[in-house]
């Protein structure tokens, strides 16, 4: 066996060691999203019931975090490229802690609604910045520790940490709020951020990557096709997350929450079991198959005559969506110099933020005009467009590789 072939098949021990290296830093993403998830399901009720504001104000107060995340993506990429991933993560965790302090103050000022809502909005804005810094920094920190050959595994594990923390945080936050008082959530956010900050300081930083740095606008232009693919794939996730419970209710079906659980379980399972296929077969080929699975699942949701069929549809959608972000992300990051990886990752992630922000109101219009099943039909069309786009990108890559080899 040649040295090259031996290196291409890592031993179980080296694979486990690599996973530990990755998990040790994406754990900070888990902590960050735990600080997001814990108050997430509690805050709308607090704003509407305790402070007396309308449901629109409650929704806006929560959603402002996502706009802060979107707006701070360029900052996160620049920090990761110029200050280093570790310092970027530390700044993000500090922002998460500050958001907890502002959240605690918002609960304390509940008797003065205007002051309380102002503090809450400030908390959400700071948390959005922290989310962007930690998410981008943790991925680049992981890549710096294990090498670019494991880009897909790092991105996949970071996604598992993200969605796992949100899935755990929301019900735990509701339970704590009911058992104690909501203000405890602010204290818990501060404590988690402080713990993450302490642990992050103990881990060795990775060297800064020097060399050519592209402008953010140039990076955004270069990763635009990949980002559009991510946006198309995210429409399915956004549709299920927002409308599956209303879809079940309109059909008078029970256990809508089970469909979300199945979606999340298949999502995490696919990332755990199949992340290495991106390295083996290439990002575009994996994306084509992933979009096809997602499209099939969404079509099943559209046509489902009984809950069991809808459940299978949700499962297929979660399985398909799981690898779209890392598959296209690996190809996007490969298009820029090493010194601009942070900018590429943040620019690429912008399309996820935009897609989730746009899907809600657009799908709401479709549901109101044509019914809830048509929401999933539209998302299936988006996934089918993702298949076509990924196929075009794969063929273009093959042509460029062929011309390069011929030269």
UniProtKB/Swiss-Prot annotation:
PROSITE patterns: MFS. It comes from Burkholderia mallei (strain ATCC 23344). The keyword Cell membrane applies. Keywords: Cell inner membrane, Cell membrane, Membrane, Transmembrane, Transmembrane helix, Transport. It is found in: Cell inner membrane. The chain crosses the membrane at residues 22-42, 51-71, 101-121, 126-146, 154-174, 179-199, 227-247, 258-278, 286-306, 309-329, 347-367, 369-389. This is Uncharacterized MFS-type transporter BMA2043. GO terms for molecular function: transmembrane transporter activity. PANTHER family: MAJOR FACILITATOR SUPERFAMILY MFS_1, RESISTANCE PROTEIN MDTM, PUTATIVE-RELATED-RELATED. It is a multi-pass membrane protein. Pfam families: MFS_1. Belongs to the major facilitator superfamily. YhhS family. InterPro entries: MFS, MFS_dom, MFS_trans_sf, MFS_Transporters, MFS_YhhS-like. One of its GO terms (cellular component) is plasma membrane.
